[in-house]
Amino acid sequence: MSKQTLILLYGGRSAEREVSVLSAESVMRAVDYNAFEVKTYFITQSGDFIKTQEFIETPGDDEKLMTNDTVEASQAIKPSDIYEEDAVVFPVLHGPMGEDGSIQGFLETLKLPYVGTNVLSSSVAMDKIMTKRILEVAGVPQVAYTVYIEGEDLEAAVAETLEKLTFPVFVKPANMGSSVGISKAENESELRSAIDLALKYDSRILIEQGVVAREIEVGILGNTTVKTTDPGEVVKDVAFYDYQAKYIDNKITMDIPARVPVEVMTQMRAYAAKAFRALGGCGLARCDFFLTEDGAIYLNELNTMPGFTQWSMYPLLWENMGLSYSDIIKELVVLGQEMFDKRESHLI
């Protein structure tokens, strides 16, 4: 039986490129090499594409993907050279220039099927402010928030925040993930400092009401038919689940399935599917919720390319539902091919 080529794109230009490498290494080990051969391309911080490795069987435990330390800029290729007939691309890229619709548009221009959400849903879901506004219309509950756009009146934005929200608040770049650039503010001085920090990553800033809540996550898989997982809970040993805690210090554990009432579980799964459809989602996503002591549910964000390491919540949620990591990859390839065929048919 001939194998299908699975092209892994990893690295990227965003601050989340290190997470991308970890995710891609997990994917390359989980692939069913009876069905696929894998070709990998590293995207450097400057945006160059470099062909790195090929795998026809499961790599050894000590084999790592090539990164900035092991590739040479002279090996850069034209981005369009990744094209291969009958291949499917898995863009294991996080953050701006990865899951914001940019790479998705590029792959559609090349007429390459790819894993994950399309251009529109990727770009909308990447922007936390746009996501908030769309989900408001869809009737999905969220915490109160204000917005600051660089160039607007900062004093007016601070005053609005002080009027509408109470401390603590969380200040977030609108277009970053993995908690990059996010900080907690306990007073006006910290609020201003947090805005300054967030502006280093984006010109659009979201300021959210802090809530005392459990963090519960639901996995999503599908195109027109949307499947969801039982929720899992992030159990933290730190006050704020930031980038350092998530990927460097390993100060979190996960409770799968989450210990929540059946009615809460059912409602979260319904909200996750509703949000996914409202944003035009396809392929996959992870929906993150807050659950307060009084039982209030708030959708925090919808992540269209969740972390894919072997210890990440998304694959673990599906494994709890009986779908192995390897089978998740197969299903995502099928869904990506299905969306490609649909896009092509709509052009006729």
UniProtKB/Swiss-Prot annotation:
Binding, Mg(2+) 1: 288, 301
Gene Ontology MF term list: ATP binding; D-alanine-D-alanine ligase activity; metal ion binding
InterPro entries, alphabetized: ATP-grasp (IPR011761), ATP_grasp_subdomain_1 (IPR013815), D-Ala_lig_Van_CS (IPR000291), D_ala_D_ala (IPR005905), Dala_Dala_lig_C (IPR011095), Dala_Dala_lig_N (IPR011127), PreATP-grasp_dom_sf (IPR016185)
GO biological process: cell wall organization; peptidoglycan biosynthetic process; regulation of cell shape
Cofactor note as given: Binds 2 magnesium or manganese ions per subunit.
Function according to Swiss-Prot or TrEMBL: Cell wall formation.
The protein's name in its UniProt record: D-alanine--D-alanine ligase
Organism: Streptococcus thermophilus (strain CNRZ 1066)
